[in-house]
Each structure stands twice: as C-alpha cells, then as structure tokens.
C-alpha cells in the first residue's frame, strides 16, 4: 500500500474577476464528526468543475454546503465562508430560498414532480405570482431548449413528466433548475442512474449550459470527469488534496496520490 503525504496539497486559484463562487475555511460537522476539514476553493465562471474522490471523501457534502442543502440535516453544522458576489451566503440572516435561485441544484436521481412536463417548469414561477401564459410559455420553451429536451417533448408538454425516460427526466430537472436563471448549477452525480447514451446526452447538455452557467459536478466516473470538465478537484477524507485543470489532473498530476487515484492504483 502506498504511503502519501496528506499535508502536501496543490490548489489552483483564479483572478478575482473570474471567480463565480468561492469558499474559505469551510468545515462541515455531523454532530461531533468533522466531515469537511477547512476547504478553500474557487470556481471559475462559465466553466465545469468536477469533484472526485473515493466514497466518503466528502465531495457531495461539500457540494451540498455551497447552497446550504446541509441546513436540512438537523445534526449538520457548516462553518467558514461561502462567497457569492462578495456576500457570505453562509451567514444566518441570508434568505436561503432566494439564494437558491442563484445557486441551483440537480440531484443524483431524477426527481420530477408528479405533474405535467409544462407544470414541472412553471410551478415555481406560478407560486411566485407569474400568471401571464405567454411569459410562462416562453420560460418553458427557453428552459427546455437549454436542457436539450424541447424537440423531444414540445408536442407532449401536458403529459405527465413521469412518462419520460430516466435521461429525459434528469434533463427536465435541469430545465426546472435553470428556469429561474441561476448563475451556478450544482450537480450531484447526475448521471449515476442513467445509461451510457443518456449520460452522453447529459454531458453534451452540460457543454451547452456552461455558456450561460457555472457548473460544479460531483462524479464517481473518472471518464466523465475527464471528458466533461474544465477543472477537477480531488477530495480525500474531507480534504481537498489537488485542484487543477482537468487535463493536468488526469495526465500530469502534481501529487502521487492524485495520479494513483485517477489511474486506478490508489490504496
């Protein structure tokens, strides 16, 4: 078994004007257990960043902290700064629901509402008081086009979303998330329940989406990280070990631990 120096790290940083989101000294605790150990990380605007690492490394916990999804867990506590547009969104006075309009999330398994395809998109807007049908129609079409789903469902908008395939349901969930025009889209293993063809379609959708959004994705699939991301961060035991351009991580990692992990020789 290889012995690694876990105190040795290599973390990429960006000029401030390119940063869409950043964290400073973020820790996450579940009760007395420290799951995330003081992570400093910056995410470049309009790029795709992949978070990789073994199961239990903390990458999903860290991702969920970025728009305070960990708030839903009673024993979870998040400390440190999560900076979006110069504002620490981890402060207690922040309106979490408003913040999530700017930092949206797509979950591991597709979770469409048991409503029509159309109302999956419009539901949040209707609750916010949007009543003009033309406006709602435009939101639906724009969002579905951005999620590369419009051509497949435009004649079936009033059918149940539950009739869609798994890949289509996941792209509908993406359309629903981006319909409120977030700046940042968090994706927690969005392809884990999809077949290879649907996964490829999802990755193609991500490439298009990054023109308008900053995407941060957790994946266990090394090939997906290598194919679909601009930057990759390697997590281990709640810490960020190496963060660099994806090509560097997979072809010329600075640290032996990272190189061993992405090449399948870790341990």
From Swiss-Prot:
Its main location: membrane. GO terms for cellular component: plasma membrane. Keywords: ATP-binding, Cell membrane, Membrane, Nucleotide-binding, Phosphate transport, Translocase, Transport. It is found in: Cell membrane. ATP binds at residues 53-60. Pfam families: ABC_tran. Its EC number is 7.3.2.1. The keyword ATP-binding applies. One of its GO terms (molecular function) is ATPase-coupled phosphate ion transmembrane transporter activity. It catalyses: phosphate(out) + ATP + H2O = ADP + 2 phosphate(in) + H(+). Residues 21-262 form the ABC transporter domain. It is an enzyme of class 7 (translocase). It is a peripheral membrane protein. GO terms for biological process: phosphate ion transmembrane transport. The complex is composed of two ATP-binding proteins (PstB), two transmembrane proteins (PstC and PstA) and a solute-binding protein (PstS). Belongs to the ABC transporter superfamily. Phosphate importer (TC 3.A.1.7) family. Part of the ABC transporter complex PstSACB involved in phosphate import. Responsible for energy coupling to the transport system. NCBIfam families: 3a0107s01c2. This is Phosphate import ATP-binding protein PstB 2. It comes from Streptococcus pneumoniae (strain ATCC BAA-255 / R6).
